[in-house]
Amino acid sequence: MLSYFAELVTRTDEDRRAFETHPVLIDAVAHGMNVQRYRALLLELYHVVWHFNPVSAAAASRMSDAWMPIRHFLYEHMHEESGHEVWVLNDLEAVGVAPEAVRAHAPAVH
């Protein structure tokens, strides 16, 4: 499992560094986030959180027993993440976005 984790860190290091040095992230950390930007972030986050469990379940169901530790890791995180989309919906409602509008919002494609 450790070798898998080490490989994962190595393969994603460049993207992690790009994320950590992105001007939008640096600005948000340094100056905070206005409501408009927070709302936009939450609208995108909703789709990530909402799709996490189905995607993880699909991945876990296709893994051979050789990948059982990863399968169990996914199952644990699916359990931990269950219901988090409700938190995002609640935060969006607090900044003036109705749940129906959130569900109708198409995520950005990058």
Describe these PLM feature segments.
Residues 1-110:
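Non-heme di-metal
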